């Protein structure tokens, strides 16, 4: 596993809990001390899996290759940054390792993400006889598997799909992001995008919003965003007439975001800053990226768990033609308690909902249930064994048939 942030911490805990499946495990990251701390916390919690750690720069293909050649993993779980997907995939191909990630590739110098860069690896993974599993977090990931499950068991044709993501938690901070601030702010300041009648429709950032009611939470203002799983789902389920992704934001969060943008702190280009030298002898010109500097001063998402209250609610609202030939609606979702996630893994619910599915995807691969040569999005595999594990591993799902979808 590459990465040692909140999601990686959760995934590591869950791997240690399933030592009957995962017998050999290594965590590697830019800072080995972070990997060692995860292992220490896992062993303190009473899990006995032998976990190796290593230092690696995931931007460097040669370093990755040296690590993979030494350890010889069957599967590499990429929980590093989206900028690093392609270097890790290259190293996997060079060393005969299969691959799994939770977020699609995004170039560092452009706030833009899509699957085409990774789909371009299909033939190379196929020829090498290796599996690449893309987008195996919650959204993307579980939301795509929910859709596959609905298509397999409840619908002849899915016509309308709305993925809804609510974080109704309170971390008692004026402003903080629930995962890497740089990635988070880049994502939500982009233009919105949804699929309707065979084409992509673009909106201004956060332009479209409406109140949606979430189970056990109530109504929350939900905003239409561009989210990557829509891109693969409309290809794999061509009967879909419209597919959208919605996420909740509080007014305080949006006000901070507006100020960050207005003062130029969301910029991803380099600016030159004259930094005074420590000995007072003058200044040095240094290049900094404002958004990366902002990340350094914002709360670390890994430190939010302790005082986090409330829960997340993420699911799919689907309308289409059921197996009986009549129109039906279907809502499948999970609610996850921040407090319960923290008590189990030391991390908050947003990290938990991404880290658990990453482990389950790895389990599906290791058991031979999700193993075929090529590059695949998760909805292209059998959803049933994954759905079964969600209930066992801490993310139970619930269904509402023929309810009001509000959309």
Residue ranges and their predicted role:
Residues 56-73, 80, 84:
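Conserved Rossmann-fold cofactor-binding substructure of NAD(P)-dependent oxidoreductases
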Residues 45-60:
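Rossmann-fold cofactor-recognition segment
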Residues 8-12:
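N-terminal Rossmann-fold NAD(P) dinucleotide-binding loop
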